[in-house]
A protein has these predicted regions:
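A hydrolase-biased, glycine/serine/histidine/acidic-enriched motif that marks catalytic-domain neighborhoods
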Residues: 1-281
């Protein structure tokens, strides 16, 4: 994991009348196990694709402020790789939540613009809602060796705590100012709650929501979702001002969407989602 981000797919761009500039690169954040192994299984997405692994993987280091600290670090890594222009962010499971946090951090960047977010079967941990168990994904194939298993387990345990403690970022208009604890938005009605403030997002939902009873609980960590966690938006419909444009069903359950049987379908749908989010109006 010395190279971070790592280039997973290199797109050989040729200028055409319809495509005058290279496609926006996609940065995919690691799963709950801390690795980007699964993203190497994807078919061509028609753009440069980078994977960001957990740099604390295999160490005794932890993230002081959880997902917020992680996102700050990853935002810097992204800026070093792509200092200006348009980009896409995304990730599987935990990675989708971290991508949302990174997008909020980069929202104030004048040179780098997040044109969209792609969340792969990520669930929104709505505070104050009834909860049930759901699990944080990682790819077991990447951790078959004993030493890898232990490193992965540590990342999963930390991810479990991170999600439980995560406070999702608040999306505001750039002109919003906070004075005396109140938000004043120039040119906007104070009761205007209809305009989404985040980059547009597309959520991929595994169509088989059942958890395999034979799955060893040591291979997954729990996170909190509402009792309607199987609903189409996986809780993101309750995320205020979050611009969720579309929910795309994809074959498999939370753990098998990258399997040989399902990854081709996922790849095609991911490519379509990237194209939609970057389409110039």
């Amino acid at each position: 994991m010395n190279q971070n981000p790592i280039l997973i797919q290199r797109h050989h761009y040729r200028k055409t009348f319809a495509q005058k500039t290279p496609p926006e690169p996609l940065f995919l954040i690691h799963d709950g196990g801390g690795t980007v192994f699964s993203y190497f299984l994807l078919g061509s997405l028609g753009r440069n694709v980078y994977g960001i692994s957990n740099p604390h993987f295999g160490t005794d280091l932890t993230w002081t402020n959880g997902i917020a600290s992680m996102a700050e670090c990853y935002a810097k890594l992204i800026k070093e790789t792509c200092p200006f222009g348009d980009i896409l962010l995304g990730g599987w499971s935990l990675g989708g939540l971290v991508a949302v946090q990174i997008a909020q951090i980069l929202s104030g960047d004048s040179e780098l613009n997040v044109t969209g977010i792609i969340m792969i079967d990520s669930t929104f941990p709505a505070e104050g809602q009834p909860i049930k168990t759901r699990r944080i994904a990682f790819n077991a194939e990447a951790s078959t060796r004993p030493e890898m298993t232990e490193k992965t387990r540590k990342c999963m345990n930390e991810a479990q705590l991170q999600i439980r403690q995560w406070t999702p970022p608040v999306w505001r208009f750039p002109m919003a100012e906070v004075q005396d604890g109140q938000s004043h938005m120039a040119g906007l009605k104070m009761n205007d709650t209809t305009t989404p403030l985040s980059p547009p997002a597309i959520l991929f939902r595994a169509t088989d929501n059942s958890l395999d009873s034979n799955t060893d609980v040591s291979e997954a960590s729990d996170t909190k979702v509402s009792n309607d966690g199987g609903s189409q938006a996986l809780g993101f419909d309750r995320y205020e001002n979050f611009d969720l444009r579309e929910v795309v069903d994809t074959s498999g359950d939370h753990f098998s969407i990258f399997s040989n049987d399902n990854v081709n379908e996922l790849s095609k749908k991911l490519k379509d989602a990237c194209d939609k989010l970057t389409k110039k109006s």
